[in-house]
């Protein structure tokens, strides 16, 4: 059987931002562990991190699993050299140009598929053109879906029934019809449609709108989720999609590192703190005594909001780890005077990239203040850690509803309005401090921890042999082997 698997060659095309690329690379590792040949299509500045991460479990003498590097179209898109990931952009205008660059990868992808002749292509949902290009060579294209079944079900219900049109105010709640649970939202919380009429904005519009179509036109969709987490919504999604639905749930993919400490610390960019120092700090703390605060790779709060967060962390008198984007350059504009001296020993500030899975998995972590990105949400669930939910953009308000209303393992901080990565709701330190205390002390959090612990157990069971996600990955590989025999020849 292993010999047959080696004959199957799977190509991967990750979208170039950590929230999308990291889980896809976890998926690559899962395929490698099953003996499948893999090739990752990427660009020069992204290649070193990919190579480092995948080589953690690879035999360095083997060339079965490779990286195909194509030049990044910086000049053509109007980007400066060195910007090859969305989280490296520094303005909305630069972000839009980055999406132009993503669209300009169509011809290089065509060349890649023609040269490497993989048996299938797994491409991020943000590359709708991948389906047509792969089809030219008789290659089935799979979508790697970067959200869960619950947020996808919410989007489908909103698009089908348009309940948001029944309210007169952006702040009036409405019930999302047809879902298994009573889910209420406001217009202010809805994911914004990316619309553009000309120029740079058109590329973003095409990619985002095409992402929805890709779910219908691709060979199938791979979800980073597991059945036991959201069974009602797996069923809702597949029933709504009907015959068009070929779905595999193979998550949580981050658990590919569950037996590799170096894998937990090596995901994404090089961490801004050593694994040793991070664990040494955490090992000195009691179980469930530390709050972890991180808002993902794209969130940019105002100086005023950062100051409120700092004040809340100091006043709540709990141990904390706070991940800040970037260095100390502008901290004098908002960091309370003497803050670091006053919280020394109590607070650990990580400036830059943090080994999030390593941190969340530590028994000292008692709560996670999160933007509710799907990866962070799933990683917290996999670690059995309750959350303080602070959604900002994308589908994060939908993920918050899953955490707080369905799974009941989170406390809302009070974010109410969708925005472009900056946080439209300005929250005072009193509100933040209240949520921090709710997630760390009292009877309510004890019940949350019990539920979170049960979800962690379910997550681990799902990826072990015989579990739902393990079995779905086996089914996916078997389907690839079966389809390989009938693929068109070059």
Curated annotation (Swiss-Prot):
Positions of the catalytic residues: 20, 124
InterPro entries: UDP_glucos_trans, UDP_glycos_trans_CS
Spans traversing the lipid bilayer: none
Biotechnology: Soapwort saponins possess anticancer properties and are also being explored as enhancers for endosomal escape in targeted tumor therapies. They may also serve as precursors for vaccine adjuvants.
PROSITE patterns per UniProt: UDPGT (PS00375)
A GO MF label: UDP-glycosyltransferase activity
Leading EC class: transferase
Expression sites (tissue/organ): Mainly expressed in flowers, flower buds and young leaves, and, to a lesser extent, in old leaves, stems and roots.
E.C. code: 2.4.1.-
Organism placement in taxonomy: Eukaryota, Viridiplantae, Streptophyta, Embryophyta, Tracheophyta
Pathway terms, separated by semicolons: Secondary metabolite biosynthesis; terpenoid biosynthesis
Function: Component of the oleanane-type triterpene saponins (e.g. saponarioside A and saponarioside B) biosynthetic pathway, leading to the production of natural products with detergent properties used as traditional sources of soap.
Binding residues for UDP: 297, 353-354, 371, 375-376, 379, 393
Similarity remark: Belongs to the UDP-glycosyltransferase family.
Keywords in alphabetical order: Glycosyltransferase, Transferase
Name this polypeptide is given: UDP-glucosyl transferase 73M2
Record-level GO BP terms: glycosylation; saponin biosynthetic process; triterpenoid biosynthetic process
Domain of life from the UniProt record: Eukaryota
Source species of the chain: Saponaria officinalis
């Amino acid at each position: 059987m292993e010999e047959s698997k080696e004959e199957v060659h799977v190509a991967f095309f990750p979208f170039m931002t950590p929230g999308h690329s990291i889980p896809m690379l976890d998926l690559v590792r899962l395929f490698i562990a099953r003996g499948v040949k893999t090739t990752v299509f990427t660009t020069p500045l992204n290649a070193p991190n990919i190579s480092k991460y995948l080589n953690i479990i690879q035999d360095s003498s083997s060339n079965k699993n490779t990286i195909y590097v194509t030049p990044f179209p910086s000049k053509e898109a109007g980007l400066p050299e060195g910007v090859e990931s969305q989280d490296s952009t520094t303005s909305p205008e630069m972000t839009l140009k980055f999406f132009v660059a993503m669209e300009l990868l169509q011809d290089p992808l065509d060349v890649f598929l023609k040269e490497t002749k993989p048996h299938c292509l797994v491409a991020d949902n943000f590359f709708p053109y991948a389906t047509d290009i792969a089809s030219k060579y008789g290659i089935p294209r799979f979508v790697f879906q970067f959200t869960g079944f619950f947020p996808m079900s919410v989007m489908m219900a909103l698009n089908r029934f348009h309940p948001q049109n029944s309210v007169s105010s952006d702040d009036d709640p409405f019930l999302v019809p047809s879902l298994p649970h009573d889910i209420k939202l406001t217009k202010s919380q809805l994911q914004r449609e990316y619309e553009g009429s000309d120029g740079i904005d058109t590329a973003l519009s095409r990619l985002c709108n095409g992402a929805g179509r890709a779910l219908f036109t691709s060979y199938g969709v791979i979800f980073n989720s597991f059945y036991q987490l959201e069974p009602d919504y797996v069923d809702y999604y597949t029933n709504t999609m009907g015959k068009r639905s070929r779905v595999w749930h193979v998550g949580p993919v981050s658990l590919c590192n569950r037996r590799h400490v170096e894998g937990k610390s090596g995901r994404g960019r090089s961490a801004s703190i050593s694994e040793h120092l991070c664990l040494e700090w955490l090992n000195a703390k009691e179980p469930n005594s530390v709050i972890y605060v991180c808002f993902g790779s794209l969130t940019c709060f105002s100086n005023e909001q950062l100051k409120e967060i700092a004040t809340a962390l100091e006043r709540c008198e709990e141990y904390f780890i706070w991940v800040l984007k970037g260095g100390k350059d502008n901290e004098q504009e908002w960091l309370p005077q003497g803050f670091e001296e006053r919280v020394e020993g109590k607070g650990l500030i990580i400036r830059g990239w943090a080994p999030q899975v390593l941190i969340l998995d530590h028994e000292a972590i008692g709560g996670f203040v999160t933007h509710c990105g799907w990866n962070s949400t799933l990683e917290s669930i996999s670690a059995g850690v309750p959350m303080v939910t602070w959604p900002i953009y994308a589908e994060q308000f939908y993920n918050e509803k899953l955490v707080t209303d369905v799974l009941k393992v989170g406390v809302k901080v009070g974010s109410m309005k969708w925005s472009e990565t900056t946080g439209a709701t300005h929250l005072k330190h009193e509100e933040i401090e209240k949520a921090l205390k709710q997630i760390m002390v009292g009877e309510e959090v004890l019940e949350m921890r019990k539920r979170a612990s049960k979800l962690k157990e379910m997550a681990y069971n799902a990826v072990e042999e015989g579990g739902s996600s393990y079995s779905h990955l086996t089914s996916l590989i078997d389907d690839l082997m079966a389809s390989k025999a009938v693929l068109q020849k070059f």
